[in-house]
Amino acid sequence: MNQASPKPQSAFRPGAVTYNLLSLAAGLLVWHFAALAVASPFFPGPVKILDAFQRLAMGGDTMGNSLWDHSWGSLHRVLVGFGVAVLLGVPLGLLMGLKEGLYISTRSIIEPFRFIPPIAWIPLAIIFFSGLPRFAFLIFLGAFFPIYTATHVGVSRVEPIHRKVFMVHGASKFQILTRVVVPTVLPDIFGGMRVAMGAAWLTIVAAELTGGTSVGLGRMMVDYAELLKIPEVIVGMLLVGAIGFVLNEALLLAEKRLFRWRWQVTL
């Protein structure tokens, strides 16, 4: 019986772009007329949002920071924390997947931390860190476990017969790791990275809301919320969503191109 593995869908695949643009246009029209009907400063329409976007992009905020400064401030912190999560999560996931005894003996120590949300660490992060290390630490906590878990689960699905074949032919443990385990687990790692990127992006916005920086989309939204400037707040929200969407699509595109074979119909 033929079975097709579930595959991730990109918003940029052929045919999808048109439908996405039509949906976006319809949503903007509904939003525009709803704002006209309500006529409230607390429910601005897309025209006012566009005006606020242009002001922020061209002139910056009251501190002289442009919209791009805020966007890059958040993105830079995410990339640093995410990078550390990849560098630690992948090797540890491989180790725990290959050494079942080690995983069993340390599971009760490691696993409880998976259920502590990153924002719960904010008070400790404020006490022990400042600047970039504070945000990188929080982002790392949000991104680490999706990568670690996906890698660990991927290793557990490697067929033992594949390892035995290489062992029979005299392959070393390192060769088995690099030629059998890692290539097999890479698709799972990429899947975990996409989940981790979403968690990291959510974490940075929450972390920036607590202060400790004058640059960042979360910080920008708080500053304008205190001034009751709703259009500027919504600009920040939309940018958070747009950047997160682009990052996810970039990882998804890389995953589909590198591991096209995984989504083929198999017997």
What do the predicted segments below correspond to?
Residues A150-I189, M221:
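Short cytoplasmic-facing helical segments at TM-TM junctions of multi-pass membrane proteins
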Residues L217-L253:
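Hydrophobic alpha-helical transmembrane segments of polytopic membrane proteins
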Residues V80-I110:
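Transmembrane-helix boundary motif in ABC transporter permease subunits
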Residues L94, G101-S108, A150, G154-R157, ...:
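Membrane-spanning helices that line or support transport/gating and their immediate boundary helices
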Residues F137, L141, F174-A206, V235, ...:
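Transmembrane alpha-helices
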Residues M1-A25, E249-L267:
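Transmembrane alpha-helical segments of polytopic membrane transport and secretion proteins
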Residues E111-P146, V153-G154:
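Generic hydrophobic transmembrane alpha-helix motif, especially the helices
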Residues A37-G83:
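Periplasmic/extracellular loop-to-transmembrane helix junction in inner-membrane transport proteins
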